[in-house]
Structure formats: C-alpha cells, structure tokens
Swiss-Prot record:
Keyword set, alphabetical order: Acetylation, Coiled coil, Isopeptide bond, Metal-binding, Phosphoprotein, Ubl conjugation, Zinc, Zinc-finger
Coiled coil: 89-124
Record-listed Phosphoserine modification sites: 491, 653, 738, 740, 758, 911, 914, 981, 1009, 1014, 1033, 1035, 1081, 1107, 1175
Positions with biased composition (Low complexity): 868-896
Keyword flag Ribosomal protein: no
Cross-link Glycyl lysine isopeptide (Lys-Gly) (interchain with G-Cter in SUMO2), sequence positions: 311, 577, 1105
Protein name: G patch domain-containing protein 8
C-alpha cells in the first residue's frame, strides 16, 4: 500500500511529476484529466491565485511544480493506516467477548414466570373484552357498541331495519336473476333438445316401415344400422365413383305407413304426394344411367344421425358408377327406365329434395345433384322401360341431431321390382316401385315386393340397401332381409320381370343407396316371402353379417328391389342384438328355413320361370352382389354392393333373361360405385360373358375397356355369376333349391345369371353375406337355386351375421360383396364351378374373361362381383398400377379365386393376366392351386403384396374385398368401424394395399372375413398364400385340404372344377361344403351341400373323421351357426360370436370394429372369413350350419384363431388332421363356437406343410383356418397349430398385410399401444361380458351353449396366440404382443390352464391377464363342440393352442371373445411377414404357447 499512498509519504519528492504519475491502466482517466485543466472558477484555483500563483506557472517554491491538471487517480477504499485493524478488533471484541447485560444478570426463573403470567392475563382480559364487545357489534351496520343498551337501541332502530330490508331485497334479486338465467339456459337447452328430438323423430318417422309404424321409435329402434348404412357408407367412400344409387327418399317408403317414412314415389307427379303422411323429407331421385351417356358418379351417403355418433356404421354412402352402367348397356337401359320413373318422380323427389336440400347437395357427390340423379334415374327407368310400376325411392334424411352428417343424405333408392304382392296391395307406389324394381333388380325387387307389401316401397327402397346393410343376402343370406326379402320371393316371381327390368338397375342403384339407409330403418324387411313384418321383430342381418338381429318390424323397410332389403335405420342405435342373437339362433334354424324358403321362394320364383329365376338369381345374386356387396359396404358399400351386384347380377341374369340385367348390373355397379364401378363393368362384362348370348359383346366391350372394372365387376359378377354359376352348379347337383335347375349349363347359367343378376342383390346381399358368412355360398347356391336356398339359413344367419358383422362383413362385404360373392362363387364355384366351372367356363369361356366373367358365371358372378368389387378395388386403385393390376388381377384372382376354383385352378397366382388367361387352368388348378394359389394370392396379396402376383392376385382378391371394403373404407375406413372397417379395409386394402400392405391385410382380413371367399380366401388364401410362398407345390394339397376343406367354397369350386389337382371328391366335397355352407339354403344346402359335403366329407373323412362329426355337429348347430358371426369387419375379432356367436360377436365386433375397425376387422374379417370358410367347409353337409358357420367362422376365424388350439388340441386327441376338423365341425355346429373349428384348423393346417395342412385342413376343416394359418406366414406354416389362432386374425390382418408380404404390414400398421390394448381388452371384456350374458341366454335357448361356447374360446385363445405367431414377432407391437400374451395367457390360464397337456404354455398364457378369458365358460361348450378331450386336442397335434381342456372349463364364459377381437387386431395385422418370427417373435406370446408349441407347431417344424 506504500506506493499507493506515496504522495502522503513525508519522504516523497515533490519536485517532479513522479508523485503525480498516472497509474497504469487508466488511460482514459489520464487523458481526461489532461484535457481538462482546472477551471478558473475552481475554488482551488482561486486559492492558489490568492497565494500569488498565476495560470501557467509551476507549483512549488521554485515554481517548478506541475502546470498541467492534477492527474485523476483511482483511489481504492482504504480506511487509512491501521483503520481496518482497529475496526476488526472492535468487531471481535463485540462478538466474541459479549458482556452480560444487567437485565440478564438480574433475570431469574421466578421473574420469567411472573412476566409470563402477566402477559397471559393481559391476553385473557383482552380476549374477554373482545368477545364481550363482539356481542355488541352490528355486522350489518358495521358498528361497535360498548354497552348492551346501546346495542339494543341500535338493533331496534329504523336505520338498522332499513339496512336489513335492503340486504334481503338485494339477495332476493340476485337469486332471482341467477335462477332466471339458469332457467333461461335450461329452457334454451330443452328447446334445442326438443328440436333435435323432433327432427330426429321426423326423420325416424320418414323412415317408418310401411306397416310397422314409425321406423325409428326412440325406444323401439335405435339399433345400429346393421352396418347397412355402414356398408353404404363404405360403399360411398369406397365406391367413390359415386352412387347413381342415390335413392329417392320416401318413394319407396310405404305410404300406408303414412307418417313415418317420407315415401316419395318417384312417379311422374306423385313423388312426395305418394307419401301423404310421410314426412316430406324424403328426396327421391332416379338415377339414370344412359348407356350412351356415362352418368357421372352419384354419391349417396346414408347417415343415420344418432345421439351416439359412435356408430359410424350408421353412415352409409352409396356410389353408383354410371360409367360402369354405361358399359353395361342392358344395365343402363333398366337404369334409364328406372331413371324414367325416377325422373317422373323427380319432381316429387325434387320437392323432397328441397326438403332435403342439404341432402341433395350432399347427394351429388360425384354425380351432380339429386336432380341430376333423379333425372338419370328417370332416364334409367325410361330406358329400362320398366313396366307399369315406377321405381320408388326412399330418402333418409339424417336427424338433425346427427353429429355426422353424411355427404349424402340417407337416400334409400330402391327400384321396386314388380309390385310385390304385398307391395301392390300396400301401395299404389308398388306399381311404380314394381316398375323400378322390375328393371334393375328383378330378384331384389321381387323379394322386396313380395315380402313387403306396404313395406314394399320401403322395403324395396331399403331392400337392397337394407338387404345390403341389414340383410345383406336378401335371398339366402339376408337374415332379416333374406327372410323378408325372401318372403318377397313370391312376389318376386310376379315382380320378377319388372324387377328384372327396373328393380335391378334402379333398385340396385337406388336401393343400394337408399334402401340401405332407409331399408334398414324401414323394416327389418320381410324378405322371407310375401310376408310383411308380421311379427314385432324380424331377423335382420347385422353388419357383421353373421348375426341376425331381431329388428323391430316398424323399423324395417322392404324393397321390391332385388335384395328386397329392408334396411332399418336405427338412429338411436338401440341394440336389438338380443333378439338378433335369438334371431341368429332361431334363424340359424329359422333362417335356413326362412332363407331356405326365401331362397326357395326366390329360387322358386326363379325356378318357375327363367325370368323369375333370373330375377331370383338376380335378386338373390343381387342381394348377394348388392347385398353381399352391401355386405361389403354395409351402408354405402353394401348399397353399392347391392346396386352394383344387383345390377351386375341382375344384369347378368337379365342380360341372359332380359338383356336388362346389364343395366341392373350396371345399376348394381352403380350401386357400389367406387367399388362397383369397376366391378360393375366387370360384373356386367362378367355377367354378359356369363350370359354370352346377351352379353358376350358387351362383355368383350366392357371387359377390354373395363377390364379392371370388369374385374371388380367380375368379382361382383362373379358373385352374381357365382350365384348363377352356383345355381348352375346347384342344378347340376340338382340342389333342392334350384327350382329351375338348368342342367344345360347355359340355361342354368342363364338362369343363374338371371339369378345371379337377381341373386346378386339377394345373393350379393344374402349370398355375399352367406358366402362371406355362409350366406354367400347360400346366395351363390341360392342363385344356383339350391345352394341359394340352402344358404338362406346360412344366408340368413350369415346375413344376420353379416349384418351384425356388416360393419365387419360389410366392411368385409365391400370385400364381402366380392368376398361373399366370391366366397359364394368360390364356395359354389369351387363346389359348383368345380362341377360347373369347366362347363360354365366352357360355356362362358367364349372368352377367358367370358369364362372369367361368365364361366365364373356363378363363380365369377360371385367372383366377378367379387372381382368387380375387386376390380373396383383394382380399378379404384388403378392408379396404383401394381395394385390396380394386382387387384384387377387380384380381382381376376379374386374372381379367379373363384374362377380358378371354378376355372380350374390350374392357373397359378403368378401373373395378373394369368388369372384371367389361366382362368380355366385356374379353375382346374384353382381347385387346389388356384384356390390355393388364388387364395394364397388373395392371402398372399392381402398378406404380402410383395408376394408376387400369386399373392398379389390372391391379395388383390383380398384387396378386391378390400376394395369393397375400400368402398366402405374410403367412406369409413374407420370401419365405420366394423362393417365399414371391413369394407373399407377391403377397399382400403384394395387402394391402400396397393400402396400399402396394411390395408391389404385388412383387405385380406376383410376378404377372409368376408364371406366364404373371405373365409375361404382368408383361409385358403392364407394357406394359399403361405402355400404360394412355401407350399406352392403343396398348394394343391394344402389348398385342397386346407382350402378345400377350410375354404370349402373354393375347394368346392375347385372340387367341382374337377380339373383341380386336389381330389375331385374332396374338391367337390369341399366345394359342396363351401357351397353348401355358402348356400345354406336348407334344402339346397342340404342337398347340394350334403352332396358336395358328403364328397368333401368323404374326402375329408379320410383326412379328418372328426370333421364329419363336427360337421354333423355343425349341422345340428345350425341354430347356433344361425347366429352368424359378424364378419370380421364388423369387429375385428369374431370371438364373441364364436362364443355367443351372435351376441358376443356383435358386441365384441362393435367394440373391435369401432375400436379398431381396420385391424380388428381385418383380423376378424380374415379370421371370420376363414372361419366361415372353415365353417362352411366343415359344415358343408349341414348347409345351414355350414353357411351359418360361414359367417360364424369368420367370426370364429378370429375366435377360431384364439380358440383354434383347443379345438385342435381336442382334435389332436382324435387325429391331428381329423381333430382339427372335429373341433371345427363342433365349433361350426355351435355357431357361437365357430372359432374353435377355425382355430383347430388354424393350428392344425399350419403344422402341416402341405399334407399336414391338407390333413389338418381336411380333417380339421382348417382349410380356411389353415389358409389363414398358412398365409399367416410361410414361416408360420411350421406353426400350423399355433399360427392359425394368432395367424388367423393375423392372417386376417395379414391378408391385408399379405399384400405387402405377410400379414405383418397390415398387422404392423395396426399396432396398439399397451394403453390401447388395455383399453381395447377392457372394452372387449365389457363387451364380452355383455355378450356373454346375452349369449348365455341365447345359447341356452338357441343351441347347446357348451357347444357354442367351447369353440369360441378355443378360437379366441388360438387367435391371440396365433396372432403373434402369425404376425412378425417384431411386427406385432410389444403392446400387441403383451396384449396377445395377456389375452392368450388369460385365455390359456382361464381356459387352457386346466386340463392341458402343456401346462407350461398355459401357465405362460396364464401370466397374461386372465380377466378377459376367465369368465369364459367353455368347458361344457368345448366338450359339446369338441368331441375330443382337451388332452386329445393337445395330444394329437402340437397345436399348442390354448389347451382345449383349458378352453373346456366351464368357468370361462365368453371372455375370450375380447381376446379374439383384441388379438386378431393386435396380432392379425402383422401375421404374415412375421409368421415365423411372430411365433418366435414374442417370447411373451411364445411363452404362452411355448410349452404347447402353440406358436411354433407347424411354423417351427417347417
């Protein structure tokens, strides 16, 4: 510090500047001090001057001091020398040596206490005073008084009283204001609610069934639209092409109903006038489809507003592709005739349209405005030159409270067939409607007309859509519709010609749209015959198409149109499942009869005269095509399917019969616009080819021009043709149902075509469903007369199932349309096409496509329809060239799936063109190879698009289904959850699978879920797919046994297509099983199915003796199977249906569908389709049961996969191959338990490479399952027993994913987070519990609960287990894996923990949360369903699925259902690619089945 204070140093030298030196580093300060000299006014300056200093002089004595300013130096804070030390000393002294204060010195304990007491006393006194004073405080006046007197005076004073009054007044005022405000709000809310309710009521009333009172009574009918709307929705979205099938609102509504429905008769002037009491909300518009003028696509969306927007299924959109119709000249003419009528009614419609202005706006999605649609319709009507009856249209306007306003109002456009007997009596409208129905949808219209009477208009309008959505298969398949529409068969006969004329086209088109939405609301639909809704309830196929809902008659709308679809709207979404379940069960028995009679009515109607038959076939086929298609697009898609299929089928029939079938076909095509657009042409072409005489030229024309379209159409037509082909087939076997068996294949085919044309609506609806669910084949056979009749039980059941699974199956049905149709045609074509395919092929083989379209007459009719759907898919995705082609070719494949089955499945699924070019070969080879390949293709494509054309073809077929689904899916890929989901999945698969595997898988799923083709394709396709990949050479065997058995339909087709490599008898057998299952007509099914199934069984018996017993069991269980499992699409897993079959499945289906429409639906669809196939195959002999199982199996496919192991285990005890069959059969017969069979064969088929698979398939009837299993993964094949359960769903998903390679893509895309899985499982559990309750009651009533339940659980368990195996281990999300494990373990623990050869796997499964499965009481059911002990199941084959015994235990009620739903979704999406991996892929899952080898049996072995 010395230097710092140097200036103060005495020693310092003052002489120089050294003392003033600036410190370094302060240049700025230094500069500043130098720049600024001291100022003269500075006090220092002045002092210096006083001393004699002058400016400029130096300082100091010698004046040598500094002259410049004194430097500024930074001074540090220094107290001075020693100051700091001193301060520190003070601080230390103060702190460390503190002195004691005086007070402290004096303070003692006593003093402290004294102070404390004093303070306390003071405080107490203060408190007391305060309390005292508080008594004299006026709060109101805020015044403190010290004395009591003062306070009293104040209280009594006016001042205080006045303040009190003011205060009270203010409080009262405030309360009043608040209450008045709240009251006003309440009133406003009430008013709004009232308005909403009023609007809803008006809308509901506008859709009241003719004789049933308001269609939607808030309490009576709030049932989901059965996926009809959903299908339509899907159709709308999937059939983006537009729906010429926009329906006039109330024209079809029965006026006698008066108020509820806005029946706008689209007569010249009557329009709304015709519906005097009906709300003027109906917009009826004719959609004209001039041949010359390709009409714009008209989009019609049917959306039933419901308080719960949850039911997307309520939304349906229908698109009619006018271009397709344009392609089908005949179709156009009927359409135009219809259009004439429609236009005649257009004024009314327009008035109605004004009422439904928004709807109208919405309506012309693609096709301009309602007016244009109406004018088109009028033109179509004029072109159709429909007889006296003008088409009537129903237009459903969604209630105001509808959250989801459809792009298009629910327009139920139904072209009435000839006035149905009932309809004629009921309405003057009937005549116009008859006219309307007459032209486009002879059969559908007839059905509706006959069965609907007053409801005819409603029914007709809704017939197709309703049939489509409500009862997809009108004739055989439409459970409710089939019953009602089939009822309309009598009238159908009378209406036949008209129906053919107008109904087909317009009804197809309109009906699909309008009918779907309105028909569902209208009446359940008295399709059974002329009978109207005589009872309070009518069985209606739910969206899943597997369950028959007991639909309130008042909600039914019956259409005259081919699928005399009674589409019932359930805006409030009341659940009629119970009745539906009952219906499914009763109708399992009843429907075979009803549908059988209905089918017979149809068939008889058709049989009596070719026109009738044509109409019948067209109707049935239409129902199938449109219905089945509608099945695919339950709401929109179904509508589309109906339209397209119906026009396609109807056209094919009419082309043959009337040459108007083409318009019908077109209509139908128009119906399923997007999907059907291509399909329509394809179908048109197909039908044309089928009806070469009438349509060869057109076929060539349409075929070349619209090959992809035609492929779709072909699919469609295939569906249609399938019905006719099956009809031919039916006649060939002379099924009882084939009233007018045309031994001459041409004639039969003409009839079939006619039937197909008519039937496509019915069979499309019914057949499709039936085929998809068992009704499809029924429809095919219904179209084929006998099978069509046989299918009724199945059809109805399937229709119910499909309706239930409409969402699923409608989703599927989009695919279901194709699938159903394809399945129908496959089943029938396999069966009949195998039998007739060659002949049919030869007859129709004027062109490969002719064969493809024609030869598949039935098969192609079905498949054409399917392919049409596919082609629609294909064409819809034409942009996706690969898929377009694959899909086209897949369509071809799809149709060829049938075609190959039918055309001799010689053709391998190697090339797109091969599908067509090798149609014959395919038919031959398809028996095992095409069916196998085709299926494999379908599966393959579905499963792994990359799987070469083989798979692509199959996949494309799957996609075609997807296409149908896509229709739906486009509209409601959410699977509108279930139906839409499937449909969309299908369409989605078609579109997206082209680009993505995921949709494809779903497509596959849906495809499988679809119908028999879905099951078959799913089953066979999966098997095929895996076969294609792994067992190409074994394909025939595998396909034959797996597909032949499992996919009886395909194998049937192949079997019938004796050219197939597989044993003809088995093929026949399979075909029969398939066909009979598909046909499900009691007689038809029994005779044809018995025949074919006998062959099949004989073939199979060698392979699987239990199969016969189980098939027999399945037969007894027809009531059970009657409960069609909703198609997979309805809700991914069909396990509930498998368990409760109907109730369980629907509930679960809804959950899965809603929850994961895509995945679940795919899985479910796949599984279900597969199971259907399996069921159908398995239940071939018991046609009804088979058909029922066709639907059930799809559900069971889902269920089956989960349940598969137990059945297989049970079977295993008997025989590895035979055992699967037995469980399958057992599950099949116990409709609720279809999954078991599927699973059996899911597990069993996979184990065998080809022979094992064959044996498994044959014996286990795991053909479908096996298909599912095999497709699950070529790798998975080694886990046949394991893969199927998981793989089935997986395959289902995989089918979609198959497009990419294995299901994994779809599977993978559909991944669930653990939370999702948990939620889903919980949801499913809840649904399951609910379903279980219902189902238990139902099962106790309808059929052996134990038998029904047992298979379901096994299916369920296998599913979750197989799923992981199927799905690539890596693909399936860990969550999925965990859930699968959870469910599998739960199922295993709950079901399989008990008597299981592999306790470890069960234990492993057990570790999976057991709650879901625990409730499932399978013990009694399993035993009844599965003859063998659980040990047997396990003993024979390492199918280590959840032990059958584990499944057997009674404690497990139906909880496995959620697993199936959950697992298929979770696991199914990624089954294919990771088939092998999947099995290995999830240690968790693996542990579940590791002990059992459930996961690895075939796959690992292989």
């Amino acid at each position: 510090m010395a230097d710092r204070f140097s200036r103060f140093n005495e020693d310092r030298d003052f002489q120089g500047n050294h003392f003033d030196q600036y410190e370094e580093g302060h240049l700025e300060i230094e500069q500043a001090s130098l720049d600024k000299p001291i100022e003269s006014d500075n006090i220092g300056h002045r002092l210096l001057q006083k001393h004699g200093w002058k400016l400029g002089q130096g300082l100091g004595k010698s004046l040598q001091g500094r002259t410049d300013p004194i430097p500024i130096v930074v001074k540090y804070d220094v107290m001075g020398m020693g100051r700091m030390e001193m301060e520190l000393d003070y601080a230390e002294d103060a702190t460390e040596r503190r002195r004691v204060l005086e007070v402290e010195k004096e303070d003692t304990e006593e003093l402290r206490q004294k102070y404390k007491d004093y303070v306390d006393k003071e405080k107490a006194i203060a408190k007391a005073l305060e309390d005292l004073r508080a008594n004299f405080y006026c709060e109101l006046c805020d015044k403190q008084y010290q004395k009591h007197q003062e306070f009293d005076n104040h209280i009594n004073s006016y001042d205080h009283a006045h303040k009190q009054r003011l205060k009270d007044l203010k409080q009262r005022e405030f309360a009043r204001n608040v209450s008045s405000r709240s009251r006003k709000d309440e009133k406003k809310q009430e008013k709004a609610l009232r308005r909403l309710h009023e609007l809803a009521e008006q809308r509901k009333q506008a859709e009241c069934a003719p004789g049933s009172g308001p269609m939607f009574k808030p309490t009576t009918v709030a049932v989901d639209e059965e996926g009809g709307e959903d299908d339509k929705d899907e159709s709308a979205t999937n059939s983006g092409t537009g729906a010429t099938a926009s329906c006039g609102l109330g024209s079809e509504f029965s006026t006698d109903k008066g108020g509820p429905f806005t029946a706008v008769q689209i007569t010249n002037t009557t329009g709304l006038a015709q519906a005097p009491g009906l709300a003027s909300q109906g917009i009826s518009f004719g959609i004209k489809n001039n041949l010359g003028t390709p009409l714009q696509k008209l989009g019609v969306s049917f959306s039933f507003a419901k308080k719960a927007p949850v039911k997307l299924e309520s939304i349906a959109s229908v698109f009619k592709d006018h271009a397709e119709e344009g392609t089908s000249e005949d179709g156009t003419k009927p359409d135009e005739k219809s259009s004439d009528q429609g236009l005649q009614k257009v004024g009314d419609s327009d008035g109605s349209s004004n009422l439904d202005g928004k709807k109208e706006d919405e309506d012309p999605q693609d096709g301009g405005s309602l007016a244009s649609t109406l004018s088109k319709l009028k033109r179509m009507k004029r072109e159709e030159g429909a007889g006296a009856t003008e088409p009537e249209y129903y237009h459903y306007i969604p209630p105001a409270h509808c959250k989801v306003k459809p792009n298009f109002p629910f327009l139920l456009f139904m072209r009435a067939s000839e006035q149905m007997d009932g309809d004629n009596t009921t309405h003057p409208k009937n005549a116009p409607e008859s006219k309307k129905g007459s032209s486009p949808k002879p059969k559908s219209c007839i059905k509706a007309a006959a069965s609907q009477g007053a409801e005819k208009t409603v029914s007709e309008v809704s017939e197709q859509p309703k049939e489509t959505s409500m009862t997809e298969p009108s004739e055989p398949g439409s459970k409710a519709e089939a019953k009602k529409a089939l009822g309309g068969d009598v009238s159908d006969q009378s209406l036949e010609s008209h129906s053919q004329k107008v109904s087909e086209t317009q009804m197809c088109e309109s009906n699909s749209s309008k009918e779907t939405s309105l028909a569902t609301p209208a009446g359940k639909e008295s399709q059974e015959g002329p009978k109207h809704p005589t009872g309070p309830f009518f069985p209606v196929l739910s969206k899943d198409e597997s369950t028959a809902l007991q639909w309130p008659s008042e909600l039914l709308i019956f259409t005259k149109a081919e699928p005399s679809i009674s589409y019932s709207c359930n805006p409030l979404y009341f659940d009629f499942k119970l009745s539906r379940n009952k219906d499914a069960r009763t109708k399992g028995t009843e429907k075979p009869k009803d549908i059988g009679s209905s089918s017979k009515d149809h068939l008889q109607g058709l049989d009596p005269g070719e026109p009738n038959k044509s109409k019948e076939v067209g109707g049935e086929k239409i129902v199938r095509s449109s219905g089945g298609r509608m099945d695919a697009p339950a709401s929109g898609s179904a509508c589309s399917g109906l339209n397209k299929q119906e026009p396609g089928g109807s056209h094919g029939s009419e082309t043959e019969d009337t040459g108007r079938s083409l318009p019908s076909k077109k209509e139908r095509s128009g119906k399923s616009h997007r999907h059907k657009k291509k399909k329509k042409h394809k179908k048109s072409s197909k039908h044309k080819r089928k009806h070469k005489a009438d349509t060869e030229e057109k076929s060539s024309k349409a075929e070349s021009g619209e090959k992809s379209k035609k492929r779709k159409k072909r699919k469609r037509k295939k569906n249609k043709s399938s019905a006719p082909a099956d009809s031919e087939r039916g006649p060939k076997p002379e099924p009882p149902g084939s009233g007018s068996p045309a031994p001459p294949r041409r004639r039969r085919r003409a009839q079939d075509d006619s039937q197909r044309r008519s039937l496509p609506a019915e069979e499309g609806s019914s057949g499709k469903k039936d085929e998809g669910g068992g009704g499809s084949s029924s429809q095919d056979h219904g179209g084929r007369k006998h099978k069509g009749e046989l299918p009724p039980s199945s059809c109805q059941r399937r229709a119910g199932t499909k309706r239930s699974s409409r969402s699923s199956h409608r989703s599927q049905p989009s695919s279901g349309d194709e699938d159903s149709d394809d399945a129908s045609s496959h089943r029938l074509h396999q069966k009949s096409p195998s039998q007739y395919s060659e002949e049919e092929e030869e007859e129709d083989s004027g062109s490969e496509h002719s064969r493809s379209r024609s030869r598949s007459g039935r098969r192609h009719s079905s498949h054409r329809s399917s392919r049409r759907s596919y082609s629609s898919s294909s064409d819809a995705s034409s942009d996706q060239s690969c898929y377009s082609r694959q899909r086209s070719y897949s369509d071809d494949s799809y149709s060829d799936y049938s075609d190959r089955s039918r055309r001799h499945s010689k053709r391998s699924h190697d090339s797109d063109d091969s599908d067509y070019a090798s149609s014959k070969h395919r038919s031959k080879r398809h028996k095992y190879s095409s069916s196998d390949d085709d299926y494999s293709l379908s599966c393959s494509q579905s499963r792994s698009r990359s799987r070469s054309h083989t798979r692509e073809r199959s996949r494309s077929r799957g996609r075609s289904r997807s296409s149908s689904c896509s229709r739906s899916r486009s509209k409601r890929r959410s699977r509108s959850t279930t139906a839409h989901s499937w449909q969309r999945s299908r369409s989605y698969s078609r579109d997206r699978s082209r680009s993505t595997r995921s949709p494809s898988q779903r497509s596959g799923s849906r495809k499988r879920s679809w119908g028999h083709e879905s099951p078959e394709e799913r089953h066979s396709g999966r098997r095929d797919f895996i076969r294609s990949k792994i067992y190409r050479s074994q394909s025939p065997h595998y396909f034959r046994s797996g597909r032949g058995e499992g996919p009886g339909k395909k194998d049937d087709g192949r079997g019938d297509d004796s050219k197939a490599t597989g044993p003809p008898s088995q093929n026949s057998n399979i075909g029969t099983g398939r066909g009979s299952e598909g046909d499900c007509s009691p007689e038809d099914k029994n005779s044809v199915t018995a025949k074919l199934l006998l062959e099949k069984i004989q073939s199979r018996k060698v392979e699987r003796k239990p199969s016969v017993s189980e098939e027999v069991q399945a037969t007894p269980n027809k009531a059970g199977p009657k409960l069609k499992d909703p198609p997979q699409g309805y809700f991914g897993p069909k396990l509930p249906p498998s368990l409760g079959n109907k109730p369980v499945l629907p509930l679960i289906g809804k959950l899965p569908a809603t929850r994961k429409p895509n995945k679940k639906c795919e899985e479910s669809g796949l599984e279900r389709g597969e199971e259907q196939e399996q069921s159908e195959t398995e239940e071939g002999p018991p046609g009804s049961s088979d058909a029922l199982f066709g639907h059930q199996f799809p559900s069971e496919e889902t269920t089956g996969p989960l349940l598969d192991p137990p059945p297989e285990e049970s079977k295993s005890g008997e025989a590895t191959a035979d055992h699967p069959v037995a469980p399958l059969g057992t599950p099949a017969h116990s409709d609720c338990y279809p999954g078991d069979p599927t699973i059996s064969h899911n597990y069993l088929p996979d184990p065998s490479d080809g022979d094992t698979l064959e044996s498994l398939d044959s014996s286990s009837q795991p053909g479908p399952v096996e298909s599912s299993l095999l497709p699950i993964a070529p790798d998975l094949e080694h886990f046949p027993s394991y893969a199927p359960p998981s793989g089935d769903p997986s395959i289902e998903s995989t089918d979609g994913a198959e497009d990419a390679s294995l299901a994994p893509l779809e599977s993978q895309p559909i991944t669930f987070t653990p939370e999702e899985m948990e939620k889903y499982s919980k949801l499913q559990q809840a649904a399951q519990q609910h379903i279980q309750q219902q189902l238990l009651a139902k099962q106790v009533k309808a059929f052996p609960a134990s038998a029904a339940l047992a298979p379901a659980t096994p299916a369920l368990q296998p599913i979750h287990i197989q799923q992981p195996a199927t799905a690539s281990a890596t693909s399936i999300t860990t969550v999925q894996h965990a859930i699968l494990q959870h469910h599998a373990a739960a199922a295993a623990a709950a079901i399989g923990i008990h008597p299981h050869p592999h306790p470890q796997p069960l234990a492993q499964v057990h570790h999976i949360p057991q709650p879901h499965l625990t409730p499932i009481s399978l013990s009694h059911l399993t035993h009844s369903i599965i003859p063998g002990h659980p040990a047997t199941f396990l003993a024979s084959h390492p199918i280590h699925i959840i032990p059958a015994s584990a499944i057997h235990p009674g404690p497990f009620t139906f909880h496995p259902v959620p697993h199936a739903a959950l697992y298929p979704t979770l696991l199914a999406p990624r089954p294919a690619a990771a088939a092998a991996t999947a099995l290995h892929l999830h240690p968790l899952l693996h542990p579940i089945f590791s002990g059992q080898d459930l996961q690895h049996p075939p796959s690992h072995g292989t």
